[in-house]
Amino acid sequence: MIVGTAGHIDHGKTALLQALTGQAGDRRREERERGMTIDLGYLYAELEADAQLTGFIDVPGHERFTHNMLAGAQGIDLVLLVVAADDGVMPQTHEHLAIVQLLGIPRALVAISKCDRVDSARVQIVREQVRTLLAPGAYADAPLIALSSVTGEGIETLRQELLQAQREVQQRSTEGGFRLAIDRAFSVAGAGIVVTGTALSGQVAVGDTLLLGPQGKPVRVRGLHAQNQAAGHALAGQRVALNLSAERLALEHIHRGHWLLAADLYAPTQRLDIDMQLLPGEPRAFEHFQPVHVHLGTQDVTGRVALLEGASLAPGERMLAQLLLNTPVHAVKGDPLILRDQSAQRTLGGGRVLDPFAPTRQRRSPERLAQLHALVNSATLEDVLPALLANSDTGLDPQRLARQFNRPRSSWVLPADVRLIDTRQGPLLFSASRWEALKSPLVEQLARFHELEPDQMGPDRDRLRRFTGSTLERPTFISLLDELLASGDIASSGPWLHLPGHQVRLSEEDEALWLELQPLFEQAGFDPPWVRNLGHDEATVRALLRKMARLGLMHQVVRDLFYPDNMIRRLTAMLLQLADANPVIQVAAFRDAVGLGRKRSIQILEYFDRIGLTRRLGDRRQIRLDSALAQHTEH
């Protein structure tokens, strides 16, 4: 169990831990000279013989060091709120309590300290103050223990309360990747660099490779301590010290706020969707795009908050919001965060991360807001997935979901209605019903294209995607088309897509001109006439021949030079025969085989290069065996 202190300056937090554990805090010279805690202190103790070690994090109480307090409050299991009997509830008591409640720390104990300085009536007054303070929140029933670090009064009662809490604390799940928010980094003679922090998820073992810091530098775990004891592995919920090694690893490159992560989780982000709450004691509403300090893990970064459901947020209210940060952070769903004002002098509120990879567009669309509300109300991936899919026309990236929830895909239990669609850029998740619903409109739009362009065989894939106005990314759209082609709902002729029964209808003028020109091309063999030599308006002939090329009946080798499809196939067969004799084909060999001049032969070969039949190697050619033309041509 990890216990963190909280409370106003000079209320006796450090002295209380010393009385409880027998270990001195405030080990830094400056802290001893000034008589107050400035940075985080760490203690470990057995609260009774043979008990598990309990870790204690002693935080500073002065408002100037609240940023240090926030770094220590992340990941603790129980907060020990200390209120001095002589002072009573003070400003930092309020702020620290607000912070630990916003962080969602599950348990609290309250120590009314310095009881040796006051009478019992004063202790009772402070008890009532504390009860009033705690009443609206999650710690309303927290035990209150009056004690004195000087006389020892109440220390044993506190010890027993902590032991009972330790027995009841739930072990954090070790599922998911390892995450450590670094709060200290130092060098040990003979060992090297050591970093410490609370393991927030997963587990780590000696020999593991992790990614460190903003650059994601690979480091190896040479050794580790868990709860201040040498160990071979450590688990989520434990205080961990890791001895790291890596090439050119320098202490000055590691700072509080850096993360140590399993490789699969490394995904820095500067845009996060959150469920935000403004503290009820705030004097004014929070405005859209207001600048803030954001404390997440042990990081302290600046940015702005874009409110997603209104122009302002009233004190005590909640709202969906998007963080736009100036520095990359690491986060997963459910991570708590604290928001402080631009000057870092006052805590404004906090929230929970919903999506660490928030979109840049459509962030306020009804579909996106529905997804975010589902994330607020659902704890697990399986719970929220149906709502996420129901409000997504473009599918969900399973790799991104695995990072968002810190859940390896092997642990997912997908609903029956979920389909995994393979695309050229990786798999996507769709609800089966929504995926099927995307098909009918596409077929209907293709039919509409045929009505508008009856003299065309059909559009290619990209033109059809533009024509339909599809919001699907190109790889996903192609996967949808592939299914329609496989099912026979759509057919293809070369690159052109069409309905199975579609027949091109030329206009009467085009039909008459084609009947006149077609014999000329067939009779010309490998040396067809140029457009200018066909005896008709060049623009009209050119438009018709390009139309016939889209139908697959002609091939435009160069501008104004077209070959019939059967001639291209004969030329392909001759090229394949040459390749049988020698896989590397010389221009001269092809020229001699077809009986044309060198210039025309090169024009034909360059056309074959463009359509993927051949690969150019200087002035030679090699057949691409995966070419559809090569595979479907007999020779």
What do the predicted segments below correspond to?
Residues 1-59, 63:
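Conserved G1/Walker A P-loop phosphate-binding module
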Residues 10, 16, 35, 58, ...:
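Residue-level signature of catalytic and energy-coupling elements of molecular machines
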Residues 84-85, 109-124, 145-153, 158, ...:
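G-domain G4 guanine-recognition motif of GTPases
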